[in-house]
Amino acid sequence: MQVELKIIMTNKILHPETVFSNVASFIHRLKTFQIDTTAGVLIFLFPALLMVVPDGGAIALLLLLLLSLVKLARSKSQLPLNSNEIWLLAIVSIYFTIELFNLWLFESDISVLDNASRFLLLLPVYFFIRKTNLSLKYVTLGILSGAIACFVIASYQKFYLGVPRAHGLQNPVPFGGLSITLGLMCLSVALTIESRQGKIWMYSGFLLACIASILSETRGAWLALPIGLVTILLLNPKRWSIKARIAGSLVTLLILTLSYTIPLIQHRVDATILNVAAYFTEANANTSIGLRLETWKAAIIGFSENPMLGIGEGNFQSTLKQLAESDRINPLLATSIAHVHNEFLSAMIHKGGLGLISTLLLFLLPLATFYRQYKSQHGERKVLLAVGIILIMSSITTALSDVFFDHHKQTLFYATYIYLIYGLACTDIQKNTAKQNSSY
């Protein structure tokens, strides 16, 4: 009986159809592993390449886009969109549609669609990511690599080349903003993972990225540090007691106070305070901060006169000139300011109330989704959601003093990580079944 059973089992294993099925299954798993691993490597490399290699981030995303299109074309699995994802896609579509309508209405240059189109172009990457078994380490180590890259290039530029402000491969303002954002994302990972060695690396990434931002002398980006630290205290990832959170608040206050003793920071902060005081007490707009505040005033005036649709992209300079000629703003603005230095005011004056709402929703909708999911998730998803919340809070803060979505690198970075976190942490739990059943 045992001999017969052994013969039957042997024949079953060696049956041609069974062998073919096993080989096909192995090849399928190998293909899936290769595609997912390649995608993970590209996601890992993306932040560092974005910061230190000309067009490096764009090339990494282009390869990821091509990989996504290949997998989506071969995949037969279905993973229905949930309400969170539908709302995200709706907001992205509305944002682009408003940009397109603004282009048509005011006959603006086609280049105004540049950054808005990136949200649409990266959608295949999102649909690909939501079906993968991508490991958390590719995302977290990628953030760390970006933070280290910021420090390396900032130190090289400041101390070896002797440039006044570290800027990476872009303007110092977006560079400083991305640096502090990467640093805060490292900190959020450090506080939500369990690995002791991982925590040390992530804390190091936080410090290095903060140094890079300091070397950029970008004051608006520095505001993200206290906002990020307070956000982390409110998220309470380690479930600290009230006493522990009070102690954490005091430590945060101490860190910020000690930061002020750094001469470079002290000089920039003191200059900011003096500029603001001069603007409001002496009506002196002939300073760096004074001109920015006067620009905000011009944007509010322009919006009040065109509240629904705005003035259109490319018409800001002519509006400044008209306001200066009527003595409603400082005449110096007409020749010295290129943009509004505030993403939300920029959306208001260029695209009106509709543009402002769509811009706000690009930040606030993912923020609300991530926070709602964060309260009920655990493990890797909770780590990713904490990263997403910090990303958005830091981005909102830097957007208060700069035209956030006018910068290619910031737009690519924000869109990529929003899609990554949605795809990995906000899809339905049934995604695991769909991913296992996917075939090519």
Label the predicted regions.
Residues 68-78, 97-150, 175-188:
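Transmembrane alpha-helical segments and their membrane-water interfaces
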Residues 351-393:
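Hydrophobic transmembrane alpha-helices and their immediate junctions
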Residues 65-66, 362, 387-440:
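Transmembrane alpha-helices of multi-pass inner-membrane enzymes
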Residues 283-294, 305, 309-351:
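Long extracytoplasmic/lumenal interhelical loops at the membrane interface
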Residues 57-68, 112-124, 173-190, 206, ...:
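Hydrophobic core segments of transmembrane alpha-helices in multi-pass, intramembrane catalytic enzymes
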Residues 45-47, 134-162, 170-237, 260, ...:
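Alpha-helical transmembrane segments of multi-pass inner-membrane proteins
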Residues 1-98, 121, 131-134, 141, ...:
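Transmembrane signal-anchor hairpin modules in multi-pass inner-membrane enzymes, especially those
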Residues 215, 236-282, 297-305, 313:
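A membrane-periplasm/extracellular boundary helix in multi-pass inner-membrane enzymes
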